[in-house]
């Protein structure tokens, strides 16, 4: 039996308690939630979580993510599929960018008012993840890069780290609610992370993240910032805000109950 824990780096009890902590699997005692506070970066927070927990499967989730009823059983089903496809898999995610640059999902995003991502028929190998939710197999022995700044692009970095070690990362049909706030434009902390990734993975560029293409020239950074400015009003109108209960969002997406009953459930969700 593989054991499961969910790790979250949170700086807001209000956001946490309105979203991730509302996920039924915690209230039902079917999974544990490990919290990290006051870390200077996502990498440091998540490495601390790895050191503080022992579960075979660690789910790194944002505090504004909601996991609908039965989500843990769907996770078990997806991991059984990827295990059958690649017994040495390292990472799995709810949303990622395929090797062909296709967006693999689906997830709900409140900031743009859409379900995003193509639903694949089987686990699909990816080059990057959206950081809203990343699943790691502890036996992969992966660690996050504590030299990486801030809170952006670590989903791309951990995938590239895995690939550099001969391991693979996948995304598949693992719905989640991302009750995220609208962001008007890329800020300086995002630019810092972009430059770091340019330097670190310069021999592997270009790389496509869910937000931007990382290229040697960096022209896509300037292009995206220009597009952000010119599309700000349109994108703001797409946002539904963050005041809707995540349970209601899950219901509207058709995800109120994701319970599935795999024949061989090897994931112990009681730990």
Give, region by region, the residue ranges found by the protein language model.
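Short, well-formed alpha-helical segments that are part of the catalytic scaffolds
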Residues: 12-27
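Conserved donor NDP-sugar-binding/catalytic core segment of glycosyltransferases
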Residues: 70-107
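Short, flexible, basic/aromatic active-site loop/helix in glycosyltransferases
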Residues: 106-131, 141
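Active-site donor/metal-binding and catalytic loop motifs
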Residues: 170-192, 196-200, 211-217
């Amino acid at each position: 039996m593989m054991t499961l824990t969910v790790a979250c780096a949170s700086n807001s009890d209000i956001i946490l308690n309105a979203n991730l902590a509302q996920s039924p699997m915690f209230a039902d005692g079917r999974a544990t939630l490990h919290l990290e506070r006051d870390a200077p970066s996502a990498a440091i927070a998540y490495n601390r979580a790895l050191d503080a927990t022992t579960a075979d499967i660690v789910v790194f989730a944002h505090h504004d993510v909601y996991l609908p009823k039965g989500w843990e059983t769907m996770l078990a089903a997806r991991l059984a599929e990827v295990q059958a496809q690649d017994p040495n898999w390292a990472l799995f995610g709810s949303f990622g960018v395929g090797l062909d640059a296709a967006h693999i999902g689906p997830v709900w995003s409140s900031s743009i008012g859409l379900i995003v991502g193509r639903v694949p028929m089987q686990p699909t190998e990816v080059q990057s993840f959206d950081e809203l939710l990343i699943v790691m197999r502890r036996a992969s022995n992966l660690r996050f890069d504590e030299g990486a700044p801030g809170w952006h692009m670590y989903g791309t970095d951990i995938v590239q780290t895995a690939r550099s070690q001969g391991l693979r990362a996948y995304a598949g049909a693992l719905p989640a609610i991302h009750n995220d706030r609208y962001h008007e434009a890329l800020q300086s902390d995002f630019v810092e992370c972009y430059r770091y990734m340019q330097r670190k993975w310069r021999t592997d560029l270009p790389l496509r993240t869910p937000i931007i293409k990382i290229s040697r020239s960096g022209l896509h950074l300037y292009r995206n910032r220009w597009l952000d400015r010119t599309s700000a009003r349109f994108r703001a109108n797409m946002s539904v805000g963050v005041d809707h209960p995540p349970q209601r969002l899950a219901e509207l997406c058709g995800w109120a109950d994701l319970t599935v009953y795999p024949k061989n459930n090897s994931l112990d969700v009681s730990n």
